[in-house]
Amino acid sequence: LTKAVLPHMLERGRGHIAVTSSVAGKVGVRLRTGYCAAKHAVMGFFDALRAEVEDEGIQVSTIVPGFVATAVAENSLAADGSAFGQADEDNAGGMDSDKAAAVIISGLSRGKREIPVGEGREMMALWLKRLSPELVFRMTKNRK
């Protein structure tokens, strides 16, 4: 999608790309290696793209949600392609989806480069990772 729209934005000299990553794109979580790798790739790609196009009038915002109370796990697919149909306790206890949407809209309207979305431990992990990556590693490693 970015490949399709970016040339038009560059031609106009303005635009705003918003993409969703995850707290897992900044903090590795045990038993979610593939997901974390994919979300780290999203962060890296759009950080680099931002550096390339910001002086051309293109804004790039990366939305970094933690747990948000949605049915995303229930509606996801299992490895065999069947409906997973099971709630995820972390998501169920997460930020209200309307509140999350308000945080995202506010961040986008203010042109924020990164928009953290969530409450509690995942937001604490983002903050702590900047101060003590080793501490966050030990915390996530020991989380069951």
Q: Where does each model-flagged region fall?
A:
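Residue(s) in the substrate-gating loop at a strand-loop-helix junction
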Residues: 22
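Alpha-helical segment proximal to the catalytic Tyr-Lys
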Residues: 7, 51-55
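SDR active-site lid
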Residues: 55-120
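Conserved active-site helix of classical SDR/Rossmann-fold NAD(P)-dependent CH-OH oxidoreductases
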Residues: 40-47, 51, 102
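A transmembrane-helix-recognition feature enriched in membrane-embedded lipid enzymes
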Residues: 111-143
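Active-site loop immediately N-terminal to the catalytic Tyr-X3-Lys motif
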Residues: 27-33
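Active-site helix of classical SDR
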Residues: 2, 38
